[in-house]
């Protein structure tokens, strides 16, 4: 799975350990999701396009670079909202395209219920964010939706992922890069990531 990029960094590993802990309180969980996302976005945006420009410093004229890639952040509602602020901190000029999927507890499949994209979505590189990448179903449906809307370049950032979901996704979209901080052991019989971190949405929004 050459499209899967495992981001390894001591700070991320340390914060992920606290994130997994069942005793971590919601306010701290939200903070950790934000901090880990902040660290991960650097790697996912490594290949953004830039152009050569001149900038006048207080001392002299300097050769410099300016971003030319227009970015659209696509959080998967609702858990990914906890990742959004950190991405905005790094890319304040990004647009946001909301994608709503809800897990059906009987089928363990994600059901689409909402989307709101900027008018120029097809001119932007989409970065889909979702803290958990389990079966891959939501990711597949999200990419399919964006492709149907004309979005050509897409990346996916997830804090933890299951190998089954990554394999399934990569077979369908080998050209879409997935960045994750951890590839966990497996999915259980309910399609929850093991060892995982529980329900990210419930822990972010304190709805346990």
UniProtKB/Swiss-Prot annotation:
Gene3D superfamilies xref list: 3.40.50.2020
Native organism: Campylobacter concisus (strain 13826)
EC class of the enzyme, as a word: transferase
Activation and inhibition: Allosterically activated by GTP.
Protein name in UniProt: Uracil phosphoribosyltransferase
Keywords: Allosteric enzyme, Glycosyltransferase, GTP-binding, Magnesium, Nucleotide-binding, Transferase
Gene name of the encoded protein: upp
Positions bound to uracil: 193, 198-200
GO BP of this protein: UMP salvage; uracil salvage
EC numbers on record: 2.4.2.9
InterPro entries cross-referenced by the UniProt entry: PRibTrfase_dom (IPR000836), PRTase-like (IPR029057), Upp_B (IPR034332), UPRTase/APRTase (IPR050054), Ura_phspho_trans (IPR005765)
Function: Catalyzes the conversion of uracil and 5-phospho-alpha-D-ribose 1-diphosphate (PRPP) to UMP and diphosphate.
